[in-house]
Each structure stands twice: as structure tokens, then as C-alpha cells.
Amino acid sequence: MKKNFISLLFVSAITVGLLSACSSAPADDNATNPKAETVTSQASHDTNSSLVSVTLNEVAHSIFYAPQYVAIENGYFTDEGINLTLVTGFGADKVMTAVLSGEADIGFMGSESSIYTYQEGANDVIKNFAQLTQRAGNFLVAREEMPDFSWDDLKGKDVLGGRKGGMPEMVFEYILKKNGINPQKDLSINQSIDFGSTAAAFSGGQADYTIEFEPSATALEAENSGYVVASLGVDSGYVPYTAYSAKTSYLNANPNIIQKFTNALQKGMDFVQSHTPEEIAKVIAPQFKETDLTTITTIVSRYYEQDTWKSDLIFKEESFNLLQDILESSGELKERVPYEELVTTTFAEKAAH
């Protein structure tokens, strides 16, 4: 497919938000859209004083989270009686801080952050109540097309990876180990380059492979500088990569608000499940004014085809266990955490039915 040219330097900048999407590390490790205001608000549908104000702090502003933006643009939150204020935190650590301090009512980030906070002894446990993405959002990009790619092809090669302990790097290393590859001995993983700059570095000739989020993966293909040969989301399995969470005290005090919020999200999920990538892209385009519709459609299609978004928001135990397997494999888990302590499916189950 012929794709529009995208400047890799520009894409490197807008990637800064997405790459922090699923890490409790500082925002410069993982991030999209520096042009997005730190605080944005729901699409302009009629609001009035009867609406309940809810502040949502998202880890990044990314096409990866399309169902959320469908819910905003189609007015589903307003329909549920919510006046939503959307804040982009640019890093899971910042999102978690906002939730713990009460600056945000709800946080949207990698669910491993709730595990870290729990292990640190948080008095008011941060509990996940809705899961949006079920795949990792990054891809392995090679210098040439490799229709018969095998993970063994990485042996002896140089790869631009991510920060140690960050979710993108942990997922990558988990896949390597699953395929019998030692991340420390069988290949060289360059962790010295900021994730927002890896696409430009790869385009400039560094390494044999690079791990990229969108829109960088599409940008490299558009410039014929790289080719997606594997999806880390597919090869790692169904991981609860990003989920909505709140303090237990907020959940207990505001069950109706959480239910309405979850209902609105479910409507966004339903729309994504019943419409084409082209239709989804048109709806969310106002959220990404700096990106042309063709590119948005290409990225939505890639995530759509790999089953990134669940049909419901129910956070299942097997996914939570896989997440802990990944953290454990990377040496980032002190001890296993009970699923029931950090997840409630009550709201998502009701919204789904």
C-alpha cells in the first residue's frame, strides 16, 4: 500500500507520549503527541450543570487507545451524564501520582503500575476496573522484508530496545526467552537511545532491528527505511497492557460514576468492534489533528488486525497472571499479588450486559 511520507524526526516527537504508556518509569523512557495539550477535555457536545465532572489522567495520547477517543468524540460520556476532563500525564508515574493525590479521579495506564504501588504498601489500594488493550502495542522492525521471519533471526544481531524494567523492554525479553533466546548473551540490545529517538536512529543506519510503537513503525515503512516483521503484541499473548484504575476509596464512594464511565467506554468498544478501521479513523481524527487521515487509518488497521482491543472491558485473571509472569521474568516482581486485591470486574461485567 502506498503510504504518505512522514518525517521521522516529527514522528519521533509524537512517539514520546505513547512509549511511556505502560511503564511506571519516567515519561522519557516510554511516550505520543507533544502537540496535545497537557489538559484536554471531552469533544464539544452540549453540557450542563447536571453533568458529573470526572477527571481522567491518561498515560499518553495515542491511536493505540482508539475506543476511548470514539467514546469521547461520539459523546458517550455526556450520554452517561459525565463531563469528562482528559489530562495527558506523559508517563505512568505521573498518572499514578495524580490518582494517589486526588488530582485525577481515574487513571489510565499500564496495570503493572498498580502492582508496584501495592508492593510499596499504598494505604488506599489502586484497583483496576476496566481493561482497554489486550496486546502490547509495539512491533519489531527490520531493514528488509522478512516473510519467513523467526525470532532466531535475532541471534547475533543488534537491536534498538528499551529501558530496563520498562514494559516494552520486558515484553520483548519475555518473547525472546519464550523462544529460547538469552537476551543478555544471544544478541545485543541497545538501551542507550531514548525511545522517542529510536526510529530516527534506525533510519540513520544504527542496528539491524528496532522495537517501535506507532506511528514510528508506519513512518519507517513509508520511507522504505524499515519493515514490520513481527508484532510483540501477538507473540507475547493477551497482556492487560493498559487499564483504568482508581483508588479503592473512590470506587467505594462513587460506584454509580464508575459504572457510567465504564458504560461509556463499553459503547466505544462496541463501536470499534462493529465498524471498519476507516470508519474508526474518521471518528477519532479530531483527536489527532497533526496526523493525516491516511496514516491514522493505517495505524488503526494494524492494531485492529492484531486484535488489540477487547470486545468488553473485563479484566480477566489469566491476563493478570501473564502480566505477573512477565514482571517476574524480568526480575521486577518482589512477590505475586492476588488478582482479587487489584482487580474488580463488577463494573465491566455490568456494562457488557
Enumerate the language-model features and the residues they cover.
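Bacterial N-terminal signal peptides that target proteins for export
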Residues: M1-L9
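C-terminal motif of bacterial Sec signal peptides marking the signal peptidase cleavage site
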Residues: G17-A21
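Bacterial signal peptide processing site
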Residues: S23-P26
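Short, glycine-/small- and polar/acidic-enriched structural segments
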Residues: N33-Q184, I189-S192, D208-E214, A230-S231, ...
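Stable alpha-helical elements in mature extracytoplasmic
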Residues: F64-P67, E73, A92-V95, G110-S113, ...
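Pocket-lining segment of extracytoplasmic ligand-binding domains
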Residues: E144, D194-F288
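Secondary-structure end/capping motifs
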Residues: N252-K334
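Conserved C-terminal helix/tail region of periplasmic/extracytoplasmic solute-binding proteins
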Residues: N321-H353
